[in-house]
A protein has these predicted regions:
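Short, structured helix-loop boundary elements
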Residues: 11, 32-35, 98
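A short alpha-helix capping/helix-coil boundary motif
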Residues: 18-22, 29, 47, 83, ...
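Glycine-rich phosphate-binding loops that contact phosphosugars or nucleotide phosphates
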Residues: 43, 53-196
């Protein structure tokens, strides 16, 4: 198929975009080991009737919703997120936006739950406050999904960290979702299955 007329710059942009993502998803033993370690933690926690709490802002919140539903329904691992407008607005009003998530974890978290935090920038204050205080509330381990600066604040609180070497929100968020859904399929043991 030939290139549509007068679209060479768009083709070049898309070629670079796809190649950037292709490099991120190239097989990498370090990432594989972290995914395996994380999945084993998740399974172990599930067997103890503990849950995973996942949170993010904006696109990362949407990813957390998708992951929590698929993980609970398809992999049979309990997972919750805090994307209810009433919870966010109530807790933000009462505790301030920077502390609403920390307080949601305080109220809903249970001893030895796992906490997954997604922040493309790694600098979201509500995510940082949640990470900083989660273990005080009994959270066992924190798994972070970040991008931009390798030494970002959110990553510094993680026991396992998935950092994306990019400064593009969409590239970072797409890769975070790819990693999280890979965890679901890794726990199930296959990527094709009936959705019942």
């Amino acid at each position: 198929m030939s290139v549509l007329p007068n679209n060479e710059k768009k083709i070049e942009f898309l070629n670079n975009y796809f190649n950037t993502f292709r490099k991120l998803v190239s097989p990498d033993i370090e990432t594989f080991n972290k995914l395996i370690k994380t999945s084993e933690l998740m399974i172990k926690n599930s067997k103890k009737n503990k849950k995973i709490i996942i949170a993010g802002n904006g696109g990362s919140a949407a990813i957390s919703s998708h992951f929590s539903v698929d993980l609970t329904k398809n992999a049979k691992v309990k997972c919750i997120n805090f994307n209810e407008a009433d919870l966010i607005t109530c807790f933000s009003n009462d505790f301030g936006y920077d502390k609403w998530l920390m307080n949601a974890i305080k109220f809903y978290g249970e001893r030895n739950d796992l906490l997954f935090l997604i922040s493309a920038s790694g600098k979201s204050k509500n995510i940082i406050n949640a990470a900083k205080n989660a273990k005080k509330f009994g959270i066992k381990k924190i798994v972070t999904f970040t991008g931009f600066n390798k030494n970002n604040p959110v990553k510094s609180y993680g026991d396992i960290n998935f950092w994306v070497d990019s400064k593009s929100y969409n590239i970072i968020e797409n890769y975070h979702q790819f990693l999280l859904l890979a965890l679901v399929d890794l726990i199930i043991g296959k990527s094709e299955y009936k959705s019942n």
